[in-house]
């Protein structure tokens, strides 16, 4: 739905040259809507001039591109267009090249009000690659290039210094882009364009490069550190963690593939693990911890006991958890605060089932997002868990992909989940009834790779849809799509 004000604004921007000439005459209250319309419709000339002459101290994508009273479209939920993003960056560059006081003129108050450009919060699902849109990797490169060019083009003319602007961004870096981003961060020190990273994601980056990058980041800005595919091990982690721990406002820490053999621990390995635990105790604001594919068997109590504050999001996918790990978590202060829990890849079918149910009971009042992909949950285990699962009254998302469930099990889940009024998404497995010649119990690898009888599954989908309609739950999405934009980020919960 669009209001008359929105439609009028869109009409004004049809002729971009005339709109740019009219900007100084328009009330500043119109600028936020002008920005959203120009960004949406790719009116790049106007968009560039809007950034150049922005009349407020803050230009925030999260404020301007969300659903508003004039337009229900939330652009933050879409990957941004390359043209619009480039126009914003060009407008910033033009603004930095404009001195605070131009020779022979009075200061132009409107032109020089902008102090913070907040480009955080853009969608980066990494799924569909539309050539007309900009990924976070491209955005990082574009902002980094602007920093470097700004520093290289600086001139020291008295009285002509541009007003500094703080640019807040989420940065993505890998081996290929590391040197470029490092140069950009160095260039922003003392520059009119100050680069501030909110969320950092580093993929496949050597340990020394990760440390060098962390040392260049502003300790007051960083909210999340996400290290992926780095295979740090305990030794590498013990080198990196003190550099991460200096970010006292860090709310989210995502570490993966931290290996250490708990069955045959070495002296060095134990020393590294103790040092890691000591550093983890320095965080005062941590709310999300992800340790996916890390060997934590029998060690979860040591890890979580060091934290100063309770977690709201905990991801322990493929961590080989033992029953005692789940029992400790259920009794800990973290359980009653959890909004998001990911136990994917941990076998919950045997002796882990009872402590897992206890954990669900403890987290029932707060849990919003539960991920149980590839947990070896068959009908028997699911049915035994349903009474406590349905007590999670606030649950919005349930992920069960890769579990050996039958059509009968899915039917029972659908019927019992009717009491969960907040539930919006269920990612379920292909029922075992739809496979041909499936071994029992089927390994997760077989469920992921074996062929599906498409005709049988189409009938199952139709039946589930009819059951949803009959129960008045047509708004709940039941899907087998694990790659869609369904799993919520902790900060969006």
From Swiss-Prot:
InterPro entries: Leu-rich_rpt (IPR001611), LRR_dom_sf (IPR032675), PRAME_domain (IPR050694). Pfam families: LRR_6. One of its GO terms (cellular component) is cytoplasm. GO terms for biological process: negative regulation of NF-kappaB transcription factor activity; negative regulation of toll-like receptor signaling pathway. LRR repeats lie at residues 111-146, 194-218, 219-246, 247-282, 283-307, 308-339, 340-360, 364-391, 392-416. It comes from the Eukaryota. Its main location: cytoplasm. GO terms for molecular function: kinase binding. Keywords: Cytoplasm, Leucine-rich repeat, Repeat. Coiled coil: none annotated. Negatively regulates Toll-like receptor-mediated NF-kappa-B signaling by disrupting IKK core complex formation through interaction with IKBKB. Belongs to the PRAME family. LRRC14 subfamily. This is Leucine-rich repeat-containing protein 14. The gene is LRRC14.
